[in-house]
Amino acid sequence: MTNKVRTRFAPSPTGYMHVGNLRTALYAYLIAKHDNGDFILRIEDTDQERLVEGALDVIYNTLKITGLSHDEGPDIGGPVGPYVQSERRNIYIEYAEKLIEKGEAYYCFCSKERLDMLRANSEALKRPFRYDKHCIDLSKEEIDKKIAEGVPYVIRQKNPTTGSTSFHDEIYGDISVDNSELDDMILIKSDGLPTYNFANVVDDHLMGITHVVRGSEYLSSSPKYNRLYEAFGWDVPIYVHCPPIMKDEHHKLSKRNGDASFEDLMAKGYLKEAILNYIALLGWNPGGEKEVFSMEELIEAFNYRNINKAPAVFDTKKLKWMNGEYIRALSLDKFHEMALPYYEEALTRDLDTKKISELLHTRVEVLNEIPEQLDFFNNLLEYSPKMYIHKKMKTTYENSLKSLEEVLPKLEALENWTFENIKEVCMNLVKELEVKNGVVLWPIRTAVSGKQFTPGGAFEIADILGKEETLERIKIGIDKLKALQ
């Protein structure tokens, strides 16, 4: 292998794309692309019981949607395949046997019952479970006999009980662990498949991975990884352990607890660019005030040494704000295209949706806010006459009624129903009555919408509703106000 930077994203196909997994993929991608390196996709499916049908498609689709394009992987191949761990079974067995020859691993024939008893004893003593090395000194004859008899076995790593193992992480610094704390972890399971930990080390070496990006929960396993690298005489890759993502101060974000996945966020109307931008900042500090980054800018700016140790809190409000920034940066045509499915779902009347998009483009932060802003376009909801009273607009029941009664015949006489003509009629009435704009415009907006807050003013709403519906709603407003007299 060359000195080229090579990173990997190695998910297990066990369900949705959790935000933490996506951040790992993003950081691995950014590290590789910052130095014109390779980003590899590897599928870790050694835990067959946890596999979920369709989850592999989720992984491929997410990488495709987000633009985190891999240079090598199961679907496109590459020079160091196969890229699916279950297809590499013989490779792992070969390397496990090399460790046995070196005296760095051993066969373990302990039954499930014996291991359960050891676990129960550990729990009773409130100690972490560690295998007691019962099989470590079996002779070759004993081993051959048991294998010939078909006794199930695993292959375990042989760790020392004295001294310490040290490793360096780019985020957490130098870490040293007493070897007495290291369990003789299983390398090859009784079904012949490797454990996650063993497969990782073998694959990362054989695939030339230079930077290993993963969550900080794997810090505790790193000494055992290092012992494997040393046993094989391999170079240790650069470790980049990322801090956990928290849903709040005390709870980690977790797909098992139903916290938002990438698919969930997309379904709620967040833009993929905003999600990636926000996730990039969960633990990484670019320095300076800038927070909105394109993918090209992220690739250029990303330095993994600026990742923080402190847990990052997933702040939905901040994500929402950032998504709003991205929506406002869209062209009107692009926003309209993205809004159309929401209009089809929410609107029951045939209206000019392009005009609605002009109103909403700068007023929504998440696309799924669109339907709640459209209800009054379908029909006039019941509202209280008190809405006509607005202190700032200086409106009362009396002057609101006067404004509506005065504007009604003028709008009825309007032959060409356009925004400009509606505006001209209303503003002429303001001059005619010698009042502030709000005295005329607030009652009209209230009458045509029945809402205190709308994504547009009186002119825009009347233009979109059309002449007949606008006049009908103004008449209803007049009746409401007359009923108070």
Curated annotation (Swiss-Prot):
GO biological process: glutamyl-tRNA aminoacylation
Primary site of residence: cytoplasm
Family: Belongs to the class-I aminoacyl-tRNA synthetase family. Glutamate--tRNA ligase type 1 subfamily.
Subcellular location: Cytoplasm
Superkingdom as given in the UniProt entry: Bacteria
Record keywords: Aminoacyl-tRNA synthetase, ATP-binding, Cytoplasm, Ligase, Metal-binding, Nucleotide-binding, Protein biosynthesis, Zinc
Family matches, as HAMAP family: Glu_tRNA_synth_type1 (MF_00022)
Record protein name field: Glutamate--tRNA ligase
Cofactor: Zn(2+)
Catalytic activity, reaction form: tRNA(Glu) + L-glutamate + ATP = L-glutamyl-tRNA(Glu) + AMP + diphosphate
Entry binding sites for Zn(2+): 108, 110, 135, 137
Coiled-coil residue spans: none
A GO cellular component annotation in the UniProt record: cytoplasm
Cofactor note: Binds 1 zinc ion per subunit.
Motif ('HIGH' region): 11-21
GO molecular function, one term: glutamate-tRNA ligase activity
